[in-house]
Regions:
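Short amphipathic alpha-helices and their capping/turn segments at secondary-structure boundaries
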Residues: 34-40, 63-80, 111-114
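Active-site and ligand/interface coordination hotspots across diverse enzymes
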Residues: 2-62, 190-191
């Protein structure tokens, strides 16, 4: 593509960036287990865990994916591994008509654990979604058990653990350590 004409003495700098994309789908493309975007292989990689995948893939981006990439780039990251509590692709998570077997691919947690090991930071970004559903709370607890070995690199967005679409943090994130809740048995509560 030809460069625009410049007046004598003007200097113009061209910047080019390539974003590598990789996605891991089920054979029937009803589940997305991973969406990876890499724009600078020399920088840190983050993994972000949200609720469920939407329409983003290796070429198309939805608003959430765009906000994730923009904010992680500003924080100095060069790649993101996007995973979800539930791997079923849908516009909005529906627990009413779907069982956990429908919402989770059998390899979901394996993929999450593999990419948590390879990531420099693991960001819990499911926000308050599902706080009123025991099923979702159980799923969150189950996944956090798998991630306990990575507690030293678990973070949340802001003090409240926001989802990337939350208006107050869309244009700027502060990552804070994610505190793992420690389960106490009945014996330790007696004192």
């Amino acid at each position: 593509m030809p460069l625009p004409l410049l007046r004598k003495g003007q200097i113009m700098k061209t910047e080019t960036t390539t974003v590598k994309s990789k996605a891991l789908f089920s054979d029937d493309r009803t589940h997305r287990l991973l969406l990876r975007k890499e724009w600078d292989k020399n920088k840190k990689a983050a993994m972000i865990i949200m609720i469920n995948p939407n329409t983003a893939d290796t070429l198309n981006m939805d608003l959430t994916t765009m906000l994730v990439i923009n904010n992680l780039n500003e924080l100095g990251f060069g790649a993101v591994n996007i995973v979800n509590l539930y791997s079923r692709i849908m516009n909005k998570l529906s627990l009413r008509f779907n069982s956990n077997e429908d919402l989770l691919h059998p390899e979901t947690d394996t993929v999450i654990e593999q990419y948590a090991a390879m990531s420099d930071a693991v960001i819990i970004a499911w926000g308050s979604a599902g706080n009123t559903s025991q099923r979702v709370r159980d799923r969150k607890a189950e996944l956090l058990e798998h991630l306990a070995q990575y507690s030293n690199k678990l973070y949340k967005i802001g003090a409240h653990g926001y989802h990337p679409l939350t208006p107050i943090i869309r244009s700027g994130w502060e990552l804070e350590p994610y505190e793992m809740e420690v389960k106490r048995n009945a014996e330790s509560n007696k004192s």
